[in-house]
Amino acid sequence: MNLSNTQLFRGLEEAEITSLLGCLNATTRSFQKGEVILSEGNITENIGILLSGLAVISCNDIWGNTSILGHVAPGSVFAEVYACIPGESMLVTVSAAEDTSILFMNVGRVLATCTNACPFHTRLVRNLLTVCAHRNLQLSQRIQHTSSKSIRGRLMSYFSECAKRAGSNSFLIPYNRQQLADYLNVDRSTMCNELSKMKRDGIIEYDKNRISLKV
């Protein structure tokens, strides 16, 4: 992956990124599908960038019910909020949805100016603030999608956002049916029934993860 295309390293040249990775003591790790990357209750000092694959962010209540909070696509940053708060236990679990490669960087080295006084280190910190702002936006969007009392309302809210982002009424969603139900905080079987009704009503068409809105 070209790191200059990621949010965290946006605006930096390849040579600058290479220099920064040395200063940040960055390491790369691989995870197999289903493997836990970071666990709820753990404390982390590392920011992660997903280089390849896909990861899912979830949380479990005391009864064992799972809620999907979001996904991590290639180039995306995760765990930055917890890493920036010393001693803060994670409230979520990050798992590999498929075979995944991740770049980890120590947040202390990211926030502190290195001994080499890299002139581009300030840009990195600004980018990190932007990443944190985007994370808050994503959480706000999930609140919006789950605010409707009806399952159809939640589905349409989410599909509408996906269509706007894709710039098309036909798009792929990153979740399977169970993950989508968890993300929208609804029962999977009931949600699947509602999807079938929406298809019969001529509102949507779908084939696995591809959704087409009939507008």
Predicted regions and their residues:
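Inter-domain helical "communication" segments and dimerization helices
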Residues: 114, 118-125, 130, 134-144
